[in-house]
Amino acid sequence: DNPFTYYGLQAAIYLKHDWAPQLAYSAPPVETKWQGSLTSRQTLSLWRLRALLEEGLIDYAREEAKFLALVKGNGAGIGQDDAKGALMMANLFSEAGNYMAAFSHAYAGLSLDPSLLNQTSASLIFPQPFLQDFQAAAERSGVNALLLVSVAKQESAFLPNAVSRADALGLMQLLPVTAKEVLPDSSRSDLFLPSVNTQAGGLYLYKLLDRFQGNIAMALAAYNAGPTRAAQWQKDLSEFPLMKEGFDPDVFIDCIPYAETRKYVGNILRNYAWYKLLTKDGTISSVQELMFQWQKAPKKQETAAKEAP
């Protein structure tokens, strides 16, 4: 029954839950004077975080937020045993650019008290940093900007300098060799620039969408596990009775043999649905209708992969 999970969202949409009244309301952030039951160490770190944010020292605030997110009290993250405290911390973490901590605290707060759901609190789980970069990448690649944001949220939690164990880089976690396929002049260091990384990510995702006839779930599986594996999974399922009448994302996701990819595809579809709800980019009657909601890029975009940004 949790609408912030893929299947919980599916159930809520199926039951025709209407979030419009709550999401139309933009509440101010939860009172930042909240103290709750904090340890002395948490209290000191929280004071430092607030002071750094007030002075506009975002880089230092981000480092303090990273430390604060790791400090535990009574077995829980700071504020996570109290709905308003969790949302207050989510807002501070978001201001500091620690979106991963913001996600988890906002999720905890809204799980404790669903009545606190509104445009402001939901946006702490589904923020849109670097939006101008994503919009520029969408214009160039032809892929919906909200889909690009949804991928970056899952890939890097919007951390521009993220580096994975496999050496995938930046917001959209691209391997340098993959980025070279679509932006031949890009360098490794370029991929830490949001403007370049989102362009490369958009162009590569467009390439996958084109290969899989605009099927978003298939393209996402390919983005995570590779196009060869995704194509094999598609082939394996082609004779499955439930797939003969049309593509069913639930069947496809449940049949993905890799647990990481199953979760990855479902989470991004959930992200995409919530971003559409929050930006009023259209009502959603089913997650299935998101499967082909992308516009094929005009011909002038077909040469974009050959050009440097």
Listing of model-derived features with the role each one plays in the protein:
Residues 42-49, 87:
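Alpha-helical tetratricopeptide repeat
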